[in-house]
Every structure is written in C-alpha cells, then in structure tokens.
Curated annotation (Swiss-Prot):
This is Guanylate kinase. The gene is gmk. InterPro entries: GK/Ca_channel_bsu, Guanylate_kin-like_dom, Guanylate_kinase, Guanylate_kinase_CS, P-loop_NTPase. It comes from the Bacteria. Keywords: ATP-binding, Cytoplasm, Kinase, Nucleotide-binding, Transferase.
Length: 204
C-alpha cells in the first residue's frame, strides 16, 4: 500500500527568505521533495529563469488558467498574480512523492481550504526591522513598494494562526533543519502509517 505524498506549504511575508530557504533545502542531497513551480505575472528578477524559478506568464495567459481551473490557488499581490498549477501537484502526491510549495500567504490560505491535510509552515523573520532590511538590500524595490510590502507583512504575520508550524528564519541552515525535522515527524504520524500496518495484518 503506497503512502500518499505530503503537500508541504512554506509561506511567509515578502522578504523573509522563502526562496533562499527553499533553494538551500533543495541543494541538500537528502532532500526528497518535488518542487512545484509557481506561475506568476511579475517580471523576472536578475538570475531567475522561466520554468525553473517560476513560470512567467502575461496577465491574459494567467486569467485563462483561472477560467479553465488549472490553478490549485492563485492570488494577486502588489499588482501581480501568483498561482500553483493543480495537475502537477495531484499527480505527484498520488505517486507517493512529497510536493513542496513556496507561495504567498494569500495562496497558502486557499490551499488550506482545498487541502486541509497539507503541512503548513510559516517562515517568520527574526524582527520587522530585519525584514525591512532584507527587502531594502534586494535593491529591486522602490520606497513606495517597500512600504507596501511592510504593511502587507504585518497583516500576514497576524495570519500565523492558520499554520501548523512556525519556523524562524534567523539562520538559513537552522531553518532548513527545522523544516526537515517537521516533515520527518509528519511522515511518522500514527494516522499516516497505521493503515499500512493494518493492511499488513490482513495479509498475514
């Protein structure tokens, strides 16, 4: 009896380091997650590649995906759309592999409704001052955009109660270790492993 994969959702405020932590996790040899690439209408940042970091789409293309129910979740954030392609997620979970989503908070709340059995991890900054510093250091945002992101971040931190776990990103290495420990523990939950053992007893 093949165990269905876990849907692991990592989200948190803009600038908290979701992408950096995800890249560090996937660079480790013992990471066995399948990364679900999000679709977005925002412009690529320096070094980002289409089909690797995101699927970059026009607003028209994205809205067509919404109409055709091709997205597990989608949200508009600071003037851009973000979403998760549904077919890939479902097929991967059925094959027994874990799917890792790195998405915005609005999107994570939608996924929570569609996949309540998912594993929801909130990546938190050590402080709001550090969060602002990380956004400013990017060098890609205007002052107005930075203020909008900070306002949104405060609202998103208040939504922490919708998550199963909170991981502080005070160190990328420690954040990765905490996430791996959470996933390991979830795979050992009685309600996930008991059916396999009960099936084994039936065969005996």
């Amino acid at each position: 009896m093949k165990e269905r994969g876990l849907l692991i959702v990592l989200s948190g405020p803009s600038g908290v380091g979701k992408g950096t932590v995800r890249q560090a996790l996937f660079a480790q040899e013992d990471t066995k997650f399948e990364y679900s690439i999000s679709v977005t209408t925002r412009k690529p940042r320096q070094g980002e590649r289409d089909g690797v970091d995101y699927f970059f789409k026009t607003r028209e293309e994205f809205e067509e995906m919404i109409e055709n129910n091709k997205l597990l979740e989608w949200a508009e954030y600071v003037g851009n759309y973000y979403g998760t392609p549904v077919d890939y997620v479902e097929q991967t979970l059925e094959s027994g592999r874990d799917v890792f989503l790195e998405i915005e908070v609005q999107g994570a709340l939608q996924v929570r409704k569609a996949f309540p059995e998912g594993l929801f991890i909130f990546l938190a900054p050590p402080s709001l001052a550090e969060l602002k510093n990380r956004i400013v250091t990017r060098g890609t945002e205007t002052e107005a955009t930075i203020e909008n992101r900070m306002k949104a971040a405060k609202e998103e931190i208040e939504l922490m109660d919708a998550y199963d776990y909170v991981v502080e990103n005070d160190s990328i290495e420690l954040a990765c270790e905490r996430i791996k420990a959470i996933v390991l523990a979830e795979h050992l939950r009685r309600d996930r492993v008991a059916p396999r053992y009960k099936k084994m007893l039936e065969v005996e």
